[in-house]
């Protein structure tokens, strides 16, 4: 169920009990003999057995860990899922999911996707006999046309990284599930479960890089995978243990702590993100702004129908050339030039040279990932300070006098 929120601006109402679940699910003090209110960091690699093969739920920390267990239970609740599994990184989660397949199987992947995902599918998974097809899944007819008898997995992001296309998850699920043997995976990194729940819209797997909004403090690298299907969960749990790409107990503790403020942080990201997007849209030095929260976004109505709001991820084209983009980036004072996103601090990057440099140039050109495309991860700073920083950097790139021409 969901509850209404006055700030939703036409988006879906927020999911009911979200904050309460983030704070309490999996955190019960009764699970510890000390009755600790904050879950413990269980660093032990092994656990005593009462007799050979008789244990209390934990044998070896790769197979299962009490701290990781707390995190997985909490995330499952937030994703509206029965099960969650934590991994050492978002790409570790991607690799593990891919191991559900065998040589000869086809993966259909959204063409505009995280550079690391593109690189893994194109340069690694393909070397092991998997067939990879990159398709614009925002166009449902193209997705349907790409499905073959060998198709076993469809991988989408929404919004996409970095050009922020919205994909209709429900429509994709309808097409994909006409066959009973295709898995639909949605990378929910850019939205988090606070703003979007892919499983409720028909996805089989919801994954994310918890490095980003879920942890929210730029000090943990982690991936999360949530599912409702018991059979799928059992297969992934086996692979999690067999491949061994699990996070450390300390990282699980930190991410679990980050979840407690997720609802508060996401509201602020939305507020600041909207303010920055509106400012950029009115700035003469900006060619185009891409933000699903703006009415100008071509899929704004889909965003309102599918999400409870938007995050702080904004993409825009600065007028001019790479030189103008570089001057803008050099003059920013609050926005840090760095890869990654979703932390409390504001970040800025140039995808063509940074996060998406591994994507072939021809593909970047088709997708619109040009030298003047800039990606912002708007943080939690004071709105006025962020706008002033962007304003002065844009003026440096495009002086009002026009002396740079």
UniProtKB/Swiss-Prot annotation:
Gene3D superfamilies in the record: Aspartate Aminotransferase, domain 1 (3.90.1150.10), Type I PLP-dependent aspartate aminotransferase-like (Major domain) (3.40.640.10)
Reaction(s) the record says it catalyses: L,L-cystathionine + H2O = 2-oxobutanoate + L-cysteine + NH4(+); L-cysteine + H2O = hydrogen sulfide + pyruvate + NH4(+) + H(+); L-homocysteine + H2O = 2-oxobutanoate + hydrogen sulfide + NH4(+) + H(+); L-homoserine = 2-oxobutanoate + NH4(+)
Location(s), subcellular: Cytoplasm
Pathway involvement of the protein, from the record: Amino-acid biosynthesis; L-cysteine biosynthesis; L-cysteine from L-homocysteine and L-serine: step 2/2
The EC number(s) this enzyme carries: 4.4.1.1, 4.4.1.2
Keywords assigned by UniProt, alphabetized: Amino-acid biosynthesis, Calmodulin-binding, Cysteine biosynthesis, Cytoplasm, Lipid metabolism, Lyase, Pyridoxal phosphate
Binding site for substrate: 62, 114, 119, 339
GO MF term set: calmodulin binding; cystathionine gamma-lyase activity; homocysteine desulfhydrase activity; L-cysteine desulfhydrase activity; L-cystine L-cysteine-lyase (deaminating); pyridoxal phosphate binding; selenocystathionine gamma-lyase activity
Obligatory cofactor(s): pyridoxal 5'-phosphate
Similarity field: Belongs to the trans-sulfuration enzymes family.
SUBUNIT field: Homotetramer. Interacts with CALM in a calcium-dependent manner.
Name recorded for this polypeptide: Cystathionine gamma-lyase
């Amino acid at each position: 169920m969901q509850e209404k929120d006055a700030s939703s601006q036409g988006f879906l109402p927020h999911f009911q009990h979200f904050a309460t679940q983030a704070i309490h699910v999996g955190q019960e003090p009764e699970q510890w003999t000390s009755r600790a209110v904050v879950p413990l960091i269980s660093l032990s690699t092994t656990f005593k057995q009462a007799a050979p093969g008789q244990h209390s739920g934990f044998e070896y920390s790769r197979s299962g860990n009490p701290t990781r267990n707390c995190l997985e239970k909490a995330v499952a609740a937030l994703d509206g899922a029965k099960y969650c599994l934590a991994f050492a990184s978002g790409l570790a989660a991607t690799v593990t999911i891919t191991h559900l397949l065998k040589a000869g199987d086809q993966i259909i992947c959204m063409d505009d996707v995280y550079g690391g995902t593109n690189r893994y599918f194109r340069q690694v998974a393909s070397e092991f006999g998997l067939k990879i097809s990159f398709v614009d899944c925002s166009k449902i007819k193209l997705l349907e046309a790409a499905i073959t008898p060998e198709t076993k997995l469809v991988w989408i992001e929404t919004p996409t990284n970095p050009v922020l296309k919205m994909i209709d998850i429900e429509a994709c699920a309808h097409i994909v599930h006409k066959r009973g043997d295709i898995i639909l995976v949605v990378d929910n990194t850019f939205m988090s479960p606070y703003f979007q729940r892919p499983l409720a819209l028909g996805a089989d797997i919801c994954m994310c890089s918890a490095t980003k909004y879920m942890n929210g403090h730029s000090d943990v690298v982690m991936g999360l995978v949530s599912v409702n299907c018991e059979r799928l969960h059992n297969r992934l749990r086996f692979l999690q243990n067999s491949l061994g790409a699990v996070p450390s107990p300390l990282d699980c503790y930190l991410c679990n702590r980050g979840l407690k403020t997720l609802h508060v942080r996401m509201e602020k990201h939305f507020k600041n993100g909207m303010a920055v997007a509106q400012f950029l849209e009115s700035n003469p030095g900006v060619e185009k702004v891409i933000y699903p929260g703006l009415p100008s976004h071509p899929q704004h109505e889909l965003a309102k129908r599918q999400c409870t709001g938007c995050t702080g991820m904004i993409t825009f084209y600065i007028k001019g050339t790479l030189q103008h983009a570089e001057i803008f980036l050099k003059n920013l004072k609050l926005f840090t030039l760095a890869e990654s996103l979703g932390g409390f601090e504001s970040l800025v990057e140039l995808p063509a040279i940074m996060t998406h440099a591994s994507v072939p140039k021809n593909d970047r050109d088709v997708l619109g990932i040009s030298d003047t495309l800039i990606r912002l991860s708007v943080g939690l700073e004071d709105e006025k300070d962020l706008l002033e920083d962007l304003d002065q950097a844009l003026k440096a790139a495009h002086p009002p006098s026009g002396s740079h021409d």
